[in-house]
Amino acid sequence: MAKAKVKQDQSPSGSALGKAANSQKQTKKQKKKKFWKNHPKIAGKTSEAKTLFPLLPPKQPQEFSSNWKALQELLKPKLNPAAPATPSEKFPKKDQKVSEKKNGDPEPPKSTPKINGGITSVTPKEAKAPSQAPPTKAVEVKKEKKRKIKAEGTEQLDPPKKPQGGTQPEPPKVDIWFDDVDPDDIEAALGPEAGRIAREMQGVTETAPPTAEKVLVKEKAFEGLTRTVAMDCEMVGVGLDGEESMLARVSIVNLFGKCVYDKYVRPTERVTDYRTAVSGIRPDDIKNGEAFKDVQAEVAEILRGRTLVGHAVHNDLKILFLDHPKKAIRDTQKYKPFKEKVKSGRPSLKLLCEKILNVKVQTGEHCSVQDAQAAMRLYTMEKKCWEAAIKAKYAGVTAAKAKGPQKDKQPPAQ
């Protein structure tokens, strides 16, 4: 028998399939190219349609976005706010019924009553009708309590009503953004209202104005003699009309305002005018005072080698029959910067303290201790500038004296 021929597999190979797929892709691309070449206007329609109607910003209220209008509606306040819940809504009906049963009248019996051995029918209305017996006091008290509780509940739930009528607007407050500045400094710079607001912001209670003693005397300071002292004297009138003056009191304070010397002087002549309204001296004060010569010697010893401060201090030295170097005297009445500040040629001590120290002195009877303290406080405020001016003044004088008129010296003959 002849051998049967084996049929070869007629299925295409992998390379043949790949070539067929590539040919199909190429034909698709070619078709697309031909289509777009023949129909060029169709592709450009979308771009033209976009450019035909450019977007412009809205000019009239009708053109605004609906979303914007909806947002405006939401922002408007609601006209009908939700009504507050009544006290009856807070508690369920079951609880109310239970409370009514507890506090109300007793319910009638369910069983029908017997009359003469027979049973009478009772309607439901008659069974539910409350008894006409007068309520007891305890029940009335409970009912009154309930009414009060309900009234209080409704008052708490109702929102507070705003007072009708035009209310006056509060005055605008000063905007103080700094909180590390002393309220006293703010008050001095911006006024009392700004100082008050600064104290409120910092939680500081407004204190009373400082007394003269706190301003003029330094607390816990040295109480002995210092290189600079201030002196003041009080005088009484002697003679026929009391016009002539005599020493009655001498007071000396140190640099810190501490009193180091204060003595009354026994008069050597008959006093005709004590000048109590001004000097504060009374007969009992000088009756047992020190002798004038003793006081004079003690004061001279204190002033020796020290700088003397005072107000019109030349009058005090004159009444004591003492002298002091002009270079070591600091008179607050003659200091030019003080004169310019208060705009006065001969300012009083009272005026200087009121304008510069913001303290009132000599409001009634004068006190020599307080006057000396005030003069010393004025000096310590201007001590640096005052001493620099004195130093420059006397340095120029000494330099001028040192130069002097010089004669031209001829050279010696040889």
Swiss-Prot record:
Biased composition (Basic and acidic residues): 90-108, 150-161
Keyword field: Exonuclease, Hydrolase, Nuclease, Nucleus
Enzyme Commission number(s) from the entry: 3.1.-.-
UniProt GO BP: rRNA processing
Signal peptide extent: none
GO MF entries: 3'-5' exonuclease activity; nucleic acid binding
Bias type Basic residues, positions: 26-42
Major location category of this protein: nucleus
InterPro entries linked: Exonuclease_RNaseT/DNA_pol3, REX4_DEDDh_dom, REXO1/3/4-like, RNaseH-like_sf, RNaseH_sf
Pfam families (alphabetical): RNase_T (PF00929)
CC annotations in GO: nucleus
Stretch list, region Disordered: 1-174
Broad enzyme group: hydrolase
Compartmental location: Nucleus
Annotated Exonuclease domain residues: 228-379
Family membership: Belongs to the REXO4 family.
Protein's name in the database: RNA exonuclease 4
Organism annotation: Xenopus tropicalis (Western clawed frog)
